[in-house]
Structures are given as C-alpha cells and as structure tokens.
Amino acid sequence: MLVYSKRMLEIILENIVTAPEGLGLPAVYAESDVLLYRQYGRYDTVAVQREGRQLLKRAEALQAEYDITALPRLAKQYAEWSKKLQQLKFKRLLHGEFAAGKGITLYVNAIRQEGAEHGWDYVAYYASVLVHERVHLLHYQAVLAHFGAAGAAVQSAEYKQAQRYWYGRQTEAAQAAVVKETLAEFARWLWCLQQGQHSIAQALLQTIEEARTCIPHYPYAGVRGLRALHASSPQAAVRAYSELWQLSLTSWQQAYARIKEL
C-alpha cells in the first residue's frame, strides 16, 4: 500500500526500485546481468520533425474553427494532413535501450554529446538515462512474474506467453510502447527533480510538448498527463501511476485507455 504522506518521488521510487513486490514483482529485485556500454546507438525513428508540428497546429486550428464533417472539402484536406502526420519521422541517436532477455545498453558518446549540447552534467544525464532503462527492466520482470515465468526456462509455455504479451499483439504493440515509455519516462522526470536537475527535467517536458501526438500512439505522449496531474495533485499522480502499472500487467489496451483519460 502506498503511503501518500510521503513525497511523490520517494513513493514511486520506493515502490518501483526498493519494494518492487508492491507492483507485482518478485520479492527479490534481480538487476540485469548485462549492462552494456557502446559508443553510439542506432537511430530512433519515432520522434516528429518540425513540419509535423506545424501540420498538427494547422489541423487542430481547422478542426476548432469548422465542423469538418459538414464540409467535405475541408474534411478531405484534414484527412490528408492527418495521414501525412503519421508518416513524418526524423532520426536521432538513442541514448539507451532495454532489450528483453538481453539487458540494458547505454550509448555513452551519444549521452555525452547530448549533455554537452545543453550544458548538462554528464554523470547526471547518464544516470537519468539509466533510471529510464531500469524501469523498463523492472516492468519486464513484473510481466514475467505475472505470467509465472520469473526464472522459467525460455522454452517453457509461461515464458513464451509472457514474451508474446510483452511485445504486444499486432495493433496492441503501439499501445504497449506508449504505456512502457510513460512509466519509464515519468519516473526519470521525477528522479531529475529529486536530484535538482531541473534543466534536464524541463527539457524532457519540452520534448514531449513539442511532439504532442503528431503520430498516433507517440510513445512519450502519455507523460504529459501524469505530469499535469502531478502539478495539481502529487498524490493523485501516485495513484494513477500505480494503477497504470497494475493495468499494464494484464491489458495494454486498458492501460493505454487509462493514459488517455489523464
């Protein structure tokens, strides 16, 4: 049970890291056996470029000003813009990633480059990336535990079922990505606040605000709702975070629907 008299970050970190059984994890938290360091990572093709943000503003203005369903010409233009928004992507270096069954990889030169460009402390930014990836690891372990696959052989039916669920089935995959990144990035944002790394925390929010939901199921968009809830009621944000975590162990669709309500 969460104790709401504590500070927001302490509650979340305690229940994710030092008391993982409270969120469906085994009593003993097993750190990844593999923590790899590489120079540069592969490119992430999810984030939205400048043209996408401009198109979204135009589409939103159009929707706000007109009843597009009653105006065929404008409805067609709106549909064309919406379709184009789904195709707009740009490349950026990944700073870290978690791979199920393989562990965490941190791309040190990409992290160093990003920190230098913004004047951030390298160690602090590095640690924030690691926090994000560790939450992914803990989340994955929670899924394994839920399906009875913690410590199970990779050939076992339980393990295979957990793996299929973790990656999401067909259309669920995009929703699963949103839920995973929301849980990991919000914890990272809170960690930055606790450590006094406010410029990093603010930059994380700016990235989310700029991207918004230009691409349907944009993975980091869900953090906006939790952050807004935290601003009005840290306790409510704690409850929403814990609820989201629990829902994610049984249904990506329900967890994603909960994010949309924030």
Which residues make up each language-model segment?
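Active-site scaffold of zinc-dependent metalloenzymes
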Residues: 54-125, 134-141, 145-148, 153-155
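N-terminal low-structure segments adjacent to metalloprotease catalytic domains
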Residues: 1-68, 123, 141, 145, ...
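Pan-zinc metallopeptidase signature
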Residues: 190-262
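Post-HEXXH active-site segment of zinc metalloproteases
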Residues: 124, 140-181
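A conserved beta-strand element that flanks and buttresses the S-adenosyl-L-methionine
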Residues: 130
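An active-site-proximal "capping" alpha-helix that borders the catalytic cofactor pocket
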Residues: 177-193
